[in-house]
Amino acid sequence: LVEEGIVSGIIAELQGYSALRREVKYGTNSRIDLLLEYESQPPTYVEVKNCHLRRDGRLAEFPDSVTTRGAKHLDELSEMVRQGHRAVMVFCIQRSDCDAFSVAGDIDPGYAEAFSRARNAGVEALAYGCHVSPQEIKLSHSIPIKD
């Protein structure tokens, strides 16, 4: 869904690339979901997290359980920024009844701390909602991230 959103131009923040590669090895025994390469700027490392949890009104949250692997990915994205690359975490909210996103720190405090460290290191975070119907699910719009 996120790759389709990039290619179609829905994710405006990730445009202008000359090549898009999937599952590229990086960090410590990890693979980045998408690597965007550009003619005249450093590559952009894009990690995608699918989000389904909604507990409070119209607020989507991630994670829905403890994810040490997710925290590791954030630390590795921070390292990519330190090396001069761009790194972006995209939360794909696979439901149409949410209008804001937040990290569920009460479910996984370690992930919340890693998210805060990553943001402070320069990792960008985006959240995108989906249009969901019986026929399809499609990335549709940006959703604000609450701290």
Give the ranges of each region predicted by the language model.
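Acidic-basic catalytic patches of nuclease active cores, encompassing PD-(D/E)XK
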Residues: 1-22
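Accessory, non-ATPase domains that flank or precede helicase/AAA+ motor cores in DNA-metabolism machines
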Residues: 17, 21-24, 29, 35-38
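Conserved catalytic cores of phosphodiester-cleaving nucleases, focusing on short active-site segments
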Residues: 32-64, 77
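Residues at the starts of beta-strands that form the adenosine-phosphate
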Residues: 42, 86-88, 124
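Structural beta-sheet core signal
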Residues: 45, 89-91, 127
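A short acidic, glycine-rich active-site loop
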Residues: 62-72
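Metal-dependent nuclease catalytic cores in nucleic-acid-processing enzymes
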Residues: 72-87
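Domain-level recognition of nuclease-like catalytic cores that cleave nucleotide substrates
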Residues: 94-147
